[in-house]
From Swiss-Prot:
GO terms for cellular component: cytosol. The keyword Amino-acid biosynthesis applies. Its EC number is 4.2.1.20. The gene is trpA. It is an enzyme of class 4 (lyase). Keywords: Amino-acid biosynthesis, Aromatic amino acid biosynthesis, Lyase, Tryptophan biosynthesis. Tetramer of two alpha and two beta chains. InterPro entries: Aldolase_TIM, RibuloseP-bd_barrel, Trp_synthase_alpha_AS, Trp_synthase_suA. One of its GO terms (molecular function) is tryptophan synthase activity. Coiled coil: none annotated. This is Tryptophan synthase alpha chain. It comes from Pseudomonas syringae pv. tomato (strain ATCC BAA-871 / DC3000).
Length: 270
């Protein structure tokens, strides 16, 4: 059983959802980003998505685009992102880490080398937003063969004809993008999310995590009552963007994480 499977199974037995947190690797700089990464589990993050900076983040909204630019300007590379995971694993061997991003940097790095180094670093899963299931052989197949989960995105526009193909080789969990559009867009209604989760459950037994547009403990709690996981990203990135110092960035992210974690943990308490 993978680290991701263990974490979702464990928290299901505890009767609560999983808090999945997203930050961009190297934003606003390597050292600060690493401190945030290392601090997230103690602040309540159950799974961490680590964004791999890329020069053309087409699926991301302004907040994450700017985070990517800050990271790239600070010298962040794919190799440094893998190094960051390795440094995290020195002290934490239990919190799952999922790398999220685009295929181009991986292709340039070399798929075989990337998969090998990601596994060695302690990466648990991949979300590659621009690599459809028709191209599984390029990355999903070698990643899963090495024990790295390959997580697919589904959206409100993924119809019943397409859904089985998207989910066929998915592993780890399913990431439901609750709002069609770029990251950081407005949030979906609970009625919409309820219907979407029910539809997904007819097609898969994998845990379902819901993201895009969740910014507050109240919103996180509402989704945690419905889904197996709650994904928050842009709200953390905004804390880094508005911070006046590295210390303020770290504190802002971890304080928000603790508040969101409390919302998720108390969501199903009667």
């Amino acid at each position: 059983m993978s680290r991701l499977e263990q974490r979702f199974a464990q928290l299901k037995t505890e009767g609560r959802a999983v808090l999945v947190t997203f930050i961009t690797a190297g934003d606003p700089g390597y050292d600060t980003s690493l401190k945030v990464l290392k601090g997230l589990p103690a602040a309540g993050a159950d799974v961490i998505e680590l964004g791999m900076p890329f020069t053309d983040p087409m699926a991301d909204g302004v907040a994450i685009q700017l985070a990517t630019l800050r990271a790239l300007d600070a010298g962040q590379t794919l190799l440094k992102t893998l190094q960051m995971v390795s440094e995290f694993r020195v002290d934490d061997q239990t919190t799952p880490i999922v790398l999220m991003g685009y295929y181009n940097p991986i292709h340039r790095f070399g798929v075989e080398a990337f998969v090998a180094q990601a596994k060695e670093a302690g990466v648990d899963g991949l979300i590659i937003v621009d690599l459809p299931p028709e191209h599984d052989a390029e990355l999903a197949t070698p990643a899963q063969a090495s024990g790295i989960d390959f997580i697919r995105l589904t959206t409100p526009t993924t119809d019943d004809a397409r859904l089985p193909r998207v989910l066929e080789r998915s592993s780890g969990f399913v990431y439901y993008v609750s709002v069609a559009g770029v990251t950081g867009a407005g949030s979906a209604t609970t009625e919409h999310v309820t219907e979407a989760i029910a539809r997904l459950r007819r097609h898969t037994s994998l845990p379902i995590s819901v993201g895009f547009g969740i910014r507050t403990p109240e919103q996180a709690a509402a989704i945690a009552r419905l889904a197996d996981g709650v994904v928050v990203g842009s709200a953390f990135v905004d804390k880094i963007a508005t911070a006046e110092s590295p210390e303020q960035a770290i504190d802002g992210v971890l304080t928000l994480c603790a508040a969101l974690a409390e919302g998720v943990r108390n969501a199903r308490v009667s």
